[in-house]
Amino acid sequence: ASTVSIKAGADAPYAALSMMLGEPMEYKEDAADDNVIFTRFEKSICLNTREEPIVEIHDFKDLYHLDEGIGSVIFDLDDTLYSEKDYVRSSFRVVERMLPEVNNIFNKLCAALEKGQPPLETVLKDAGMHSDELLLKCREAIRDHKPEISLYEGVKELFFELHTQKRSIGILIDGTPKVQRAKIEALGLDKMADEILITDELAGHGNVMEFRKPNDLPFLIMRKRLEIPCRNMAFVGDDIEKDFIAPKALGMECYWKKNEDGLYE
């Protein structure tokens, strides 16, 4: 006789116990054709059996009453927990201090942003000061600055409530690590979240875009750090196009914090 060994997913221990106890089990035909993920990170297969839609929330208090089975809540950052436009305005103040000779430069940068124009390039060209060297200096100063930003109303109270309910909190974000770390510190999230993961840090010297959402690897790493199954996790984001592809496929509960005043709305 020969033995066949199958490396299964997070439900393998449950399935093994059910078989040992002679309990009936439900199987899904052709599961590999629908909502199946194989991950080399955990060397496992995960089947998404969660059929719930993405839930739109209008107030952070809507997250006070999650299902009892949810042990961790993962949040996006930009335009989910704070206004990214506030960060951009904070960066414009840096440029204003650098270039006091440009009259009314802050308002001009804001106006270019609202028109969908590249603010720095537009304003510097209009002022007859455009150069690659000056652009680089401005961008370096922006990356190095401590942003003047604040959390949306209700975020601190929500985090306190989630911790009171013994639910862990994670922050999972794309973006330049130095910039995102500065935002996290300015918002005080480094003292409020249990785990923080910046996807670009996973790339090392490689292509950071490969690790950004909708890649599922950052979510699996977060799951491993928080030591909780994906089905017991919830994800909150603002970008309906890309934020929820991976967490939904992994079986997490998904909550959409629609932001009509977002930077990329």
Residue ranges of predicted features:
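ATP-dependent carboxylate activation and anion-phosphoryl transfer catalytic cores
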Residues: A1-D59
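N-terminal helical cap/lid subdomain that shapes the substrate entry/recognition surface
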Residues: L66-E153
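Glycine-rich phosphate-binding loop signature in dinucleotide/nucleotide-binding domains
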Residues: L66-G69, T164-R167, M222-N232
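Hydrophobic "anchor" residues on beta-strands that sit immediately upstream
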Residues: S72-I74, G170, A234
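Short, acidic loop-to-helix structural element flanking the phosphoryl-transfer center
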Residues: R143-I171, K178, D216
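Substrate-recognition "cap/lid" segment bordering the active-site pocket of phosphatases
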Residues: S150, T176-A234, E241
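Surface-exposed amphipathic alpha-helices with a cationic face
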Residues: K156-T164, R223, F244, K248
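Acidic, Mg2+-coordinating phosphoryl-transfer loop and its flanking beta/alpha structural elements
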Residues: A234-Y264
